Amino acid sequence: MESKQKVRKELRTERPSIYSFEIEELKSWLSENGEKPFRAAQIFEWLYEKRVTSFEKMTNLSKELRTKLNEHFVLTTLKTAVKQTSQDGTMKFLFELHDGYTIETVLMRHEYGNSVCVTTQVGCRIGCTFCASTLGGLKRNLEAGEIVAQVVKVQQALDETDERVSSIVIMGIGEPFDNFQEMLAFLKIVNHDKGLNIGARHITVSTSGIIPKIYEFADEKLQINFAISLHAPNTEIRSRLMPINRAYKLPDLMKAVDYYIKKTGRRVTFEYGLFGGVNDQVEHAEELAELLKGIKCHVNLIPVNYVPERDYVRTPKEQIFAFEKTLKSHGVNVTIRREQGHDIDAACGQLRAKERQEETR
């Protein structure tokens, strides 16, 4: 099995983003280049607390070290191509990468703080039939630094109003567990007290259900919140909505969930999108309650976002409430996700898909 370091280095460009480096990696690089390892903490402070935009601004570093940093690294490879702001304060960013690909990042405002939804891949290979992110397939994985830079860019926007990012959800474009090592590096960087210092319990990662990686993630014993994109109460419906279910079947997925809960002691959130006439009836709620019986979990009901390229219709409000009521009657912990950014292209992949359409006209 290839080492984590080798896998990560293979992803890096000729002059990588310094945001890709965990603090211990940066210490090693400094030692190898004749510098004191303690400088890593100073560099992290400039990157994540002061959020400077050039190495020259790192004024407590020697000119020689600043030159070395400039020769070996770039600060960020993201350029803001589009920025949309919703009436409810939701902000959606379309970032252009160094190779011309684009990715999405969303800032969501809540009563409890500001949450950033980050992307982990350019496109997605999973092929969920309700998701705009899969249109065009998977182009490439993001480096950890490209994921970190999304949060930094959003934080820089919030700096203008003296606000801060308080939580992160890894639920943007792509399957995080398909880019596992870079995702782990991202988690360690944003969670580090010298990094963005986002508490582990304020970070959520979601997967469509890549079972081997769920076991691996459980063994990491992180205090990160964990979510599963479930979207169905049985194998037949899940296979229709999510082709990944044909490779990683629902019964095996539930075994992996059980392992995760026992290994970490933490509950799992199940994301359940409601699609009119497909999975939103009371009998589906009854079946879902039976599937989740005895499992330490929370269900997040998601009214589907309309995607023009897909053919699903929205579940009526009264049906959503009936579904919720049925789950509650069986003792299932459940909430309905509050919609945000409804007046902009806020659904995952919509803004990128729109831009791609305009580019090909």
UniProtKB/Swiss-Prot annotation:
Keyword rRNA-binding: no
GO molecular-function terms, A-Z: 4 iron, 4 sulfur cluster binding; metal ion binding; rRNA (adenine(2503)-C2-)-methyltransferase activity; rRNA binding; tRNA (adenine(37)-C2)-methyltransferase activity; tRNA binding
Alphabetized SUPFAM superfamilies for the sequence: Radical SAM enzymes
Catalytic machinery residues: 104, 348
Boundaries of every Radical SAM core domain copy: 110-343
Location in or out of the cell: Cytoplasm
Keywords assigned by UniProt, alphabetized: 4Fe-4S, Cytoplasm, Disulfide bond, Iron, Iron-sulfur, Metal-binding, Methyltransferase, rRNA processing, S-adenosyl-L-methionine, Transferase, tRNA processing
UniProt remark on cofactor binding: Binds 1 [4Fe-4S] cluster. The cluster is coordinated with 3 cysteines and an exchangeable S-adenosyl-L-methionine.
Domain of life per record: Bacteria
PANTHER family: 23S RRNA METHYLTRANSFERASE, RADICAL SAM CORE DOMAIN-CONTAINING PROTEIN
Name this protein carries in UniProt: Probable dual-specificity RNA methyltransferase RlmN
Organism the protein comes from: Bacillus licheniformis (strain ATCC 14580 / DSM 13 / JCM 2505 / CCUG 7422 / NBRC 12200 / NCIMB 9375 / NCTC 10341 / NRRL NRS-1264 / Gibson 46)
